C-alpha cells in the first residue's frame, strides 16, 4: 500500500520543480519515503527528488514503483490551495493514484499510472573541485542578465570569485560574486575552490531548473571545467538535485 498526507503548498513546489524538466517519472516508494530520478527527453539534464517520510504528516508505504504522468499531476496539484491537506493514495488494483484535497470541502482526482518499473537511474557520484552556495534570487537575476546577450552561459570559478558570463556577437554580460568582499545578506553563503574552472551551459535548462525556487532558497552548485553542473536545494525538507551536461566548445 501507499498513502501519504502532506501540505499542498510544499508538495506543489517539489512537483513543479521536477516537471520543469521531465514529463513522466517513476516514484520509488518504500517505508522511508519517496525517491525518483529521470532524464529529460534530450538526455541533457537529470533530475532527482527525495521526499523522506518525515516531511509528511502521515505516511504508510510498502515497496512500489509508481509511474507518474507529471504533467497531469502538476495540473491537478495546481488546483490545490495552500491551506488544504493533500492526500495521495495508491489504488493498485485499478492502477491509479488518488489525489484528494481536504478542507471543509473534499475534492478527489484519480490519475491513471504508467506501467513502468524503476529505471535505477541515480545521480552519479562525481568528485568536483569547486562548490558554491548562493541565494537563488541572485543566481536567477544573473541568468536574466545573461539572457539579454546569448542563449548559452558560462559559469566560472577563479581567484576567489564565482562568475556568470555570457557573450554574443556584439554584446556581453558578466555578474561577479566576490568571496573576498563582505556580503551583509550572505548572497554567496559558501565558496570552496580547489582549482580555476569554467563550463558553458544551455541557458534555457538553467532557467528551468531554477524556475520554482524562492529568492531566499540556497542553491549548492558543484562545478569543474567541462563537467556537468550539479545544483542542489531543499524545499521544506525534500531534496532536489539537478545535473546538466556542459556544452563542449570547440
UniProtKB/Swiss-Prot annotation:
- Give the InterPro entries listed for this entry: DNA_clamp_sf (IPR046938), Pr_cel_nuc_antig (IPR000730), Pr_cel_nuc_antig_C (IPR022649), Pr_cel_nuc_antig_CS (IPR022659), Pr_cel_nuc_antig_N (IPR022648)
Highest taxon, organism lineage: Archaea
Does the UniProt entry include the keyword DNA-binding? yes
Family annotation (SUPFAM superfamilies): DNA clamp
Pfam families, alphabetized: PCNA_C (PF02747), PCNA_N (PF00705)
A Gene Ontology MF term for this entry?
Answer: DNA polymerase processivity factor activity
GO biological process entries: leading strand elongation; regulation of DNA replication
Sorted keywords for this record are:
DNA replication, DNA-binding
Give the residue range of the signal peptide: none
Q: Which NCBIfam families match?
A: pcna (TIGR00590), PRK01115.1-2 (NF002219), PRK01115.1-5 (NF002222)
Report the family membership: Belongs to the PCNA family.
Q: What does this protein do?
A: Sliding clamp subunit that acts as a moving platform for DNA processing. Responsible for tethering the catalytic subunit of DNA polymerase and other proteins to DNA during high-speed replication.
Subunit-level organization? Homotrimer. The subunits circularize to form a toroid; DNA passes through its center. Replication factor C (RFC) is required to load the toroid on the DNA.
Indicate what this protein is called per its UniProt record: DNA polymerase sliding clamp
Give the encoding gene's name.
pcn
Amino acid at each position: 500500500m501507499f498513502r501519504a498526507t502532506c501540505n499542498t503548498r510544499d508538495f506543489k513546489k517539489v512537483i513543479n520543480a521536477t516537471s520543469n524538466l521531465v514529463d513522466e517519472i517513476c516514484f520509488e516508494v518504500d517505508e522511508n519515503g519517496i525517491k525518483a530520478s529521470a532524464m529529460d527527453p534530450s538526455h541533457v539534464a537529470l533530475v532527482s527528488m527525495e521526499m523522506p517520510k518525515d516531511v509528511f504528516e502521515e505516511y504508510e508505504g510498502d515497496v512500489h514503483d509508481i509511474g507518474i504522468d507529471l504533467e497531469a499531476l502538476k495540473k491537478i496539484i495546481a488546483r490545490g490551495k495552500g491551506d488544504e491537506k493533500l492526500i495521495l493514495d495508491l489504488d493498485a488494483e485499478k492502477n491509479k493514484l488518488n489525489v484528494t484535497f481536504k478542507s471543509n470541502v473534499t475534492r478527489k482526482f484519480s490519475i491513471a499510472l504508467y506501467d513502468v518499473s524503476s529505471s535505477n537511474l541515480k545521480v552519479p557520484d562525481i568528485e568536483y573541485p569547486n562548490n558554491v552556495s548562493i541565494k537563488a534570487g541572485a543566481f536567477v537575476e544573473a541568468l536574466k542578465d545573461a539572457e539579454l546577450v546569448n542563449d548559452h552561459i558560462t559559469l566560472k570559478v577563479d581567484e576567489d570569485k564565482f562568475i556568470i558570463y555570457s557573450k554574443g556577437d556584439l554584446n556581453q554580460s558578466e555578474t561577479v560574486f566576490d568571496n573576498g568582499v563582505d556580503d551583509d545578506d550572505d548572497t554567496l553563503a559558501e565558496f570552496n575552490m580547489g582549482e580555476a574552472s569554467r563550463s558553458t551551459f544551455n541557458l534555457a535548462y538553467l532557467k528551468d531548473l531554477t524556475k520554482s525556487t524562492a529568492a531566499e532558497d540556497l542553491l549548492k552548485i558543484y562545478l569543474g571545467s567541462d563537467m556537468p553542473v550539479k545544483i542542489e536545494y531543499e524545499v521544506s525538507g525534500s531534496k532536489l538535485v539537478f545535473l546538466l551536461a556542459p556544452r563542449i566548445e570547440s
